[in-house]
Amino acid sequence: MGTGIEMLSRKEQHNANKLHKRLRRLVGTAIADFNMIESGDRVMVCLSGGKDSYALLDILRSLQAHAATQFELIAVNLDQKQPGFPEHVLPNYLTSIGMPFRIVEQDTYSVVKRLIPEGKTTCSLCSRLRRGVLYRVADELGATKIALGHHRDDILETLLLNLFHGGKLKTMPPKLVSDDGKHIVIRPLAYCKEKDLAAYAEMENFPIIPCNLCGSQKNMQRQVVKEMLQQWDKKFPGRLENMFSSLQNIQPSHLLDSSLYDFHGLKTGNGPVVDGDRAFDPEPFEPGVEELLSLNKD
């Protein structure tokens, strides 16, 4: 764990310990559910200087110290040469906690500013350039896994962005093969809420570095979706949890993709399809009602 918790009051320390245990449990569960980290892995943790990647590194360090599975960690930061970037912050922090690290200097900032018109979203190109550099570094370091700091809210935002603007039911997977086909990319924070990570980063007093390249783009589509999800979370408790659960409860027979379900070959006599012609029921009927409905089918 980081150094911030020791400076808290007893009550704050109790809450911080509870939060750390919850996050560690969620990360451990995600790792187990998707077989993210295996014995002997060398995990390259991509550290941006933001709250999420700090929390990711801290929690993985905690799991490394207590888990039966033996794996290595190395932190990697890409210095994109953004104006005003405090180059000393990450090396000082990583040295202070005894974490092996590598700082990679690559001026992707100038490339993005040159190619993207003023006022347009830079995130897509910036991300593409950053991925290419990180894949190369993973090769150089002999990393078997690349760990990114995307969390539950990022996954939900991406789901809605694809739905609203891409015409796809698609989001960030917890584990994937990289674009170059040579690396396994993992997202151990997949089950963690952003607000929990923000609270944890504040409690641990991580030396946060703001992103000057894209952080001020308030009108970009992702920011609009983020704010919408935050409003839903306040107004409709449990909605985000249900949305996230739906990503683990897919029923191809009740969608419209014939590549996932054989609608052409659908025939009677093979038994009912799960949920049949029931499109949506907000909650199960009482047992007596279910029995009556069953009798009406006969």
From Swiss-Prot:
A biological-process GO annotation: tRNA thio-modification
GO molecular function: 4 iron, 4 sulfur cluster binding; ATP binding; magnesium ion binding; sulfurtransferase activity; tRNA binding
EC number(s) from the headed UniProt entry: 2.8.1.-
Example of a GO cellular component annotation carried by this entry: cytoplasm
Subcellular localization, as worded in the UniProt entry: Cytoplasm
Major localization listed first in the record, in broad terms: cytoplasm
Keyword tRNA processing: yes
InterPro entries: Rossmann-like_a/b/a_fold, TilS/TtcA_N, tRNA_Cyd_32_2_STrfase, tRNA_thiolation_TtcA_Ctu1
UniProt entry tagged with the keyword Methyltransferase: no
Binding note for cofactor: Binds 1 [4Fe-4S] cluster per subunit. The cluster is chelated by three Cys residues, the fourth Fe has a free coordination site that may bind a sulfur atom transferred from the persulfide of IscS.
Catalysed conversion reaction: cytidine(32) in tRNA + S-sulfanyl-L-cysteinyl-[cysteine desulfurase] + AH2 + ATP = 2-thiocytidine(32) in tRNA + L-cysteinyl-[cysteine desulfurase] + A + AMP + diphosphate + H(+)
Cofactor(s) recorded in Swiss-Prot or TrEMBL: Mg(2+); [4Fe-4S] cluster
Enzyme class: transferase
Family annotation (Gene3D superfamilies): HUPs
Known pathway: tRNA modification
Protein origin, superkingdom: Bacteria
Extent of motif PP-loop motif: 48-53
Pfam families, per database record: ATP_bind_3
Subunit structure: Homodimer.
Note: The thiolation reaction likely consists of two steps: a first activation step by ATP to form an adenylated intermediate of the target base of tRNA, and a second nucleophilic substitution step of the sulfur (S) atom supplied by the hydrosulfide attached to the Fe-S cluster.
Function: Catalyzes the ATP-dependent 2-thiolation of cytidine in position 32 of tRNA, to form 2-thiocytidine (s(2)C32). The sulfur atoms are provided by the cysteine/cysteine desulfurase (IscS) system.
Family: Belongs to the TtcA family.
Name assigned to this protein: tRNA-cytidine(32) 2-sulfurtransferase
Organism expressing this protein natively: Nitrosospira multiformis (strain ATCC 25196 / NCIMB 11849 / C 71)
